[in-house]
Amino acid sequence: VLSHLNVDQLVMARDSYRLNRLGKGKDANPKQYQELFEKSNAKVRARVERLPNIKLNQDLPVTQYADKLIEAIQTHQVIIVAGETGSGKTTQLPQIAMLAGRGLTGMIGHTQPRRLAARSVSQRIAEEVGEKLGESIGFKVRFNEQGSQDSIVRLMTDGILLAELTHDRYLTKYDTIIIDEAHERSLNIDFIMGYLKQLIKKRPDLKVIITSATLDVNRFSHYFNGAPVYEVEGRSFPVEVRYRPISDLNIAGSDDDEFDDFEENLPRAVVQAVEECFKDAEEKGHPEHADILIFSSTEQEIRELQETLEKHGPRHTEILPLFARLGLGEQQKIFNPGGKGRRIIIATNVAETALTVPNIRYVIDSGFARISRYSYRSRVQRLPIEAISQAAANQRKGRC
């Protein structure tokens, strides 16, 4: 895997600036240069020894493009990887980057829009490489961190990477940055990409990989001066979309009386949709394999829907909530199902991206989410409930 690299000549990214000063110019000091070079190269060799045994998941579509992506990472400083939900790009790209020789002179930083995704994806990658979380694969979110500077891959929220820029403006801890779900275009993501565009001029050794849904890739490519785009296919089966009858209510926003009416009718509509899904599963001959993922706007709404479904929904069905503040034990029930029988997962938009909830056959989408918005007038960050975008709707559709 590392045959294209001369490991003897590699040094840690954080040491390269000091080595440049010691190697030439008025601060040149051959003795100190040699000492620092040998010390830094020893760290690189230690990282080579710590590289995990990587076996890509052959069931995921992205692995078909692994050789092409490895060559692209080695050749270009910035690449864009476009793929639909279910392609496996979130869990496989860090491993493909390691196969391309990245992670030796610094960590592979992999950003996620949400804390839940950062934790669950890091756990999944650690399992795939056969290690405990916190060894070569770690994560860092607010108030929680596993791993160290010696880790090869670090999952984190985009907010954590932004915070690190305040005290490490050259991102010397990293030799590769992966920006996942860039199409979400949050303030953090946009700021990071703007910063990276300037940083790559000063750090030619830094590689940047941007992943996105297929809608915005040309815009990202143009922004990074024609960076190559690699499209990865998603699911290999069609998804049937059924629409509930159109309501006469004109939904405008969470402050609207009409939206309140919509919220009152939502539990009833969800129960009807669940019954329709289970009926469809019975007609198609797989009644025991009909897990449902329901997208809801808020944690409170999830609790209300859970209570309604427990009272009025189908029997012998496990109903589980999924939101950002959920404990690790509760998350494990969702991502590692152990029991038999049907499940209904009620989630906020944390389930839109990154790790796919297993065994989902049906998705019920309310079409709304609580979305972070910055108010220029009041100068505060708000979380209004809004209708989701077409890109988000496609992401949700792809969860089954």
Predicted features and spans:
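P-loop NTPase motor module signature
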Residues: 1-400
